[in-house]
Amino acid sequence: MELKIVSSEIIKPSSPTPQHLRTHKLSVLDQVAGDSLFPVILFYPQACSNDTTKTSDHLKKSLSETLSKYHPFAGRFKDAFSIDCDDSGAVFVEACVAGEMSEILKQPKNDLLEELMPYKLNEKPSVPVNLAAKVTYFGCGGMALCVCFSHVIADITTAANFIKSWVAISRGFSTSNDIPDTFFDCSTVFPPQDFSSFSRNAFADNHSQSAEIITKRFTFDGVKLADLKEKIRKESSSGYQPTRVEAVSAVILGGIMSAEKEGEKFNHTNLVPSVSVNLRNRTNPPLPELSIGNIIQAAITKLPIEKRINYSKLTEQLHGSIRSIDDEYLKKFHAVGEFMNNMQNALIALFDPNNRGFTISSWCRRPLYEADFGWGKPIWVSTAMKHKDVAVLLDSNDGKGIEALVALPKKEMDKFEQDPGILAYASVDTSII
């Protein structure tokens, strides 16, 4: 795919940040997030006429208005504890491709998706922005919009809320004045810590990028997923009905266990999944849904790597670890003087040589497929990644199935694809159209 950069510029907020909102305090959850940008990529089959300039101008104007409500995304890091919301702005890149968008949608490979990003996955931006967008126009009239968010101040809920607000302003349904204030000082609930002895990325080293990492997309269609959930329910001693995410996670973890057992060196005795949990509705009182930040915490459990994979057992263990993260748990975990000890214990479990860590992040049930800027809803929403031992789960475009992006070492990916559960319930890198 031959892509040409047409322009790159800084988009500043349409109105200055009020003085009392100039400093955005980071919570400890923001501090321990990986210092990287994560992409949300939306594909529109008929997004523009021949006048791409008009489309870009419309996107830039509405982005400017949206930034006036999401002040940290136009700011810059001041120190390890705060962002200066100084209206420096966000990056907006415009690109074009002579070819058809269908070339990507028929075989959506990770390296092709990476080309649609304003920066490569392992690239450090020359300008230290917290948000960067790139619009790519195809010769067929289609368009891909990639929005990259700093993981320090955004989880997928924050990202989805930002895109939703951008859409509303773009369509004229709202102005920046209509959007509720998005600020909520999460540093009072999850107090920041002094991590001066090591970098923010110390917590992300287990998922370092590597050329040997392969990312593939596994699609669990709605019919097979419903059958899987029912099978798990029948096999469960308690009759527990798993969620779609729990069922897919169990199959993925089962595949990891199978790949471990088939490996040349079977060094791990336990699989330690780390499942990202949205904390907004788990505190008492709940945090506002529009809270800005990386307001997630990992539910960690230790699973013995066994010869016989039992999906009902896996889902119940996952469900138990997720359910345990409630207000009482969070208050104890983040109590004064306790956080560092609790975090250290979690890291010891993840980096124990007998344990194999694996991260699961669910983007399901976010309104990403509702992002209609005026030219229809996206035909596909995805992301790109190269982090080792990570799975990102997204809704399929029909809303019934789940697409799982799984990143593994190449040799292990070959074994993972041949796992009986993966073969039975998932299709690999299938066409979107």
Curated annotation (Swiss-Prot):
**What cystine pairs are annotated?**
none
Specify the pathway. Answer: Secondary metabolite biosynthesis; terpenoid biosynthesis
The residues that cross the membrane are: none
* Keyword terms of this UniProt record: Acyltransferase, Transferase
State its Enzyme Commission number(s): 2.1.1.-
- The answer to whether UniProt assigns keyword Chloroplast to this entry is no
Tell me which residues this entry annotates as catalytic: 151 (proton acceptor), 372 (proton acceptor)
Using the UniProt record, name the top-level EC class of this enzyme in a single word: transferase
InterPro entries per record: CAT-like_dom_sf
Tissue pattern of expression reads:
Mainly expressed in petioles and, to a lower extent, in roots.
Please provide an example of a Pfam family that matches this protein in its UniProt record: Transferase
Q: Which reaction does it catalyse?
A: (21S)-21-acetyl-1-hydroxy-apo-melianone + acetyl-CoA = epi-neemfruitin B + acetate + CoA + H(+)
The Swiss-Prot or TrEMBL record annotates one GO molecular function as: oxidoreductase activity
Against PANTHER family, the record matches this protein to: BAHD ACYLTRANSFERASE (PTHR31623:SF28), F21J9.9 (PTHR31623)
Q: What does this protein do?
A: Acetyltransferase involved in the biosynthesis of limonoids triterpene natural products such as azadirachtin, an antifeedant widely used as bioinsecticide, and possessing many medicinal applications including anti-tumoral, anti-malarial, anti-rheumatic, antibacterial, anti-inflammatory, anti-pyretic and diuretic effects. Catalyzes the formation of epi-neemfruitin B from (21S)-21-acetyl-1-hydroxy-apo-melianone.
**What assembly does the database describe for this protein?**
Monomer.
> Member of which family?
Belongs to the plant acyltransferase family.
Q: What is this protein called?
A: Epi-neemfruitin B synthase L1AT
Origin species: Melia azedarach
